[in-house]
A protein has these predicted regions:
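NAD(P)-dependent short-chain dehydrogenase/reductase
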Residues: 127-129, 138-197, 202-213, 236-238
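Hydrophobic alpha-helical packing elements
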Residues: 15, 87, 131, 173, ...
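Residue-level signature of the cytosolic catalytic core of signaling kinases
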Residues: 123, 166-170, 227, 270
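Solvent-exposed, non-membrane alpha-helical residues enriched in polar/charged side chains
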Residues: 21, 140, 175-179, 263, ...
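N-terminal Rossmann-like NAD(P)+-binding domain of SDR-like oxidoreductases, especially those catalyzing
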Residues: 1-158
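C-terminal substrate-binding subdomain of Rossmann-fold SDR/epimerase-dehydratase oxidoreductases
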Residues: 181-281
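Short beta-loop-alpha junction of Rossmann-like oxidoreductase domains
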Residues: 121, 161-164, 232, 253
């Protein structure tokens, strides 16, 4: 990536923290917009500019930017049933304003879509999944109607450095199990534990985002490993007692990334295996 002026929405969140860190190392000038509904000042990195701003305030965007990474949305699946107004505000109203401004200024956008759109039962799985799918479709439409340049990236169950900074119980199961083991309490498994996930290290997510920003193709890319593990297998890797709790609304059974297109088109190569990572903790 050549030196660019880049806006990262949600830059004080877990993924934003890691992305900005990498973008700065590559010599880019980076500004973050975050309303700190989930992000934290603990994620601020020296060298980046941080502005407390909702994406509905997209009128502040100007044509000095070369690229926008749009990560700043409501990101909780299960709570979205009770917080549907917030999810709509962040993920539909805010995103529309930002996308429309990017179209007006001819600034390309890399969007952090949700892999829930690609799973059964898809976009109707939860308010969160529906709104994220709506935004992805809107970006596709803006590409067709107005020539907006974009890529959409779908994340699969992110773990690794920085992701433990998600300040609520709706964290990655990896972080939950790690904390439960440290506190010497049983690992809690929702449902029967046979649900399978593609667990992706945050460094691999960042690799994919950088590649997507360098290769704007008006395309969609799944960022995962192409390998799935059941929650029971993840728990076994922690080698700690477990207990089962009732399933939650919005939980899905399976989620496996199909990364062939991403690898062939962008040169994406996942590097971290989740079981190896757990055993190194």
């Amino acid at each position: 990536m050549n030196s660019k002026k880049i806006l990262v929405t949600g830059g004080a969140g877990a993924i934003g923290f890691n992305l900005i860190q990498k973008l700065l190392k590559l010599g880019n000038k980076v500004t973050s917009w975050d309303n700190y509904s989930a992000g934290t000042t603990d994620n601020h990195i020296q060298g980046a500019t941080y502005i407390n701003r909702h994406t509905k305030e997209a009128s502040f965007l100007d044509n000095s930017y070369d690229l926008v990474y749009h990560l700043g949305e409501y990101s909780k699946v299960v709570p979205s049933f009770d917080e549907i107004e917030n999810a709509f505000d962040y993920n539909v109203l805010g995103s529309f304003n930002l996308i429309n401004k990017c179209r007006e200024l001819d600034i390309p956008i890399v969007y952090a879509g949700s892999s829930t759109r690609l799973a059964e039962p898809g976009q109707l799985h939860s308010p969160y999944a529906f709104f994220k799918s709506t935004v992805a479709k809107l970006i596709e439409g803006y590409g067709d109607w107005y020539g907006l340049r974009y890529n959409i990236c779908y994340f699969y169950n992110v773990f690794g450095p920085g992701t433990n900074l998600w300040a609520n119980e709706w964290q990655s199961v990896i972080n939950i199990f790690k904390k439960q083991r440290e506190e010497e309490i049983p690992l809690t498994i929702t449902g029967n534990g046979t649900q399978k996930r593609d667990f992706t290290h945050v460094n691999d997510i960042i690799q994919g985002l950088i590649l997507a920003g360098d290769n704007l193709k008006n395309d969609q890319f799944q960022l995962g490993t192409g390998i799935e593990y059941s929650v029971l297998e993840i728990a076994a890797a922690f080698d700690h007692p477990i207990e089962f709790i009732p399933p939650r609304p919005g939980d899905r059974m399976n989620g496996l990334a199909k990364i062939e297109h991403t690898s062939e088109t962008l040169g994406y190569k996942p590097t971290v295996n989740v079981i190896d990572y757990i055993k190194s903790l």
